[in-house]
């Protein structure tokens, strides 16, 4: 699976902005440790379409909008918001779906404070390949992981390997900034 420079740039922007539609969802829902109610799940499932809507007038991100909208479509058609099936889902959205799911499984979340190991998360991706995830994308992701674990480099010969650096999502950046910008209950509010 070879992607060009333009596709990689689109994927990078979509990766940063894919959860932008969560911006209006209350923290009590976003950070809820228990299972979401039906109403809360419906609200959460609207975030891809809301993200696309927020960016509708940003012409520079026209190519990324479908990736943001479709990053929760399941390969078998049971995802959201449009219930697309297989190849109907843009390839870059299928890649984003795998990356987003892997990150979610390997990070601490309110509903899962103990994250899965990368190996356990990859097993989940494999288990749901052909159901939730594009099997070819999962396979390519596995090859990338295996190559990195073995120390193989896909960089130019003679160049030092560039380490993979996790890039925070827009939501993570906004949350971090909000924590630092808002007064806490122990700090007096500025007049």
Task: Tell where the protein language model's regions lie, with residue ranges.
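Metal-dependent catalytic cores of enzymes that make or break cyclic nucleotides
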Residues: 1-191
């Amino acid at each position: 699976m070879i992607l060009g420079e333009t596709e990689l740039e689109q994927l990078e922007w979509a990766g940063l902005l894919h959860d932008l539609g969560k911006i209006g969802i209350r923290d009590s829902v976003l950070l809820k440790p228990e299972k979401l109610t039906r109403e809360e799940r419906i609200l959460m499932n609207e975030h891809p379409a809301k993200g696309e809507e927020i960016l509708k007038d940003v012409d520079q991100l026209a190519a990324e909008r479908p990736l943001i909208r479709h990053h929760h479509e399941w390969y078998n058609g049971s995802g959201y918001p449009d219930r697309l099936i297989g190849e109907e889902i843009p390839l870059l959205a299928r890649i984003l779906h795998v990356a987003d799911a892997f990150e979610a499984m390997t990070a601490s979340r309110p509903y899962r404070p103990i994250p899965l190991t990368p190996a356990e998360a990859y097993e989940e991706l494999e288990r749901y390949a052909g159901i939730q995830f594009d099997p070819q994308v999962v396979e390519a992701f596995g090859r990338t992981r295996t190559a990195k674990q073995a120390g193989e480099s896909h960089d130019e010969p003679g160049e030092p390997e560039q380490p993979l650096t996790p890039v925070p999502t827009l939501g993570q950046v906004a949350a971090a900034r909000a924590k630092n910008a808002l007064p806490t209950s122990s700090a007096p509010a500025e007049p």
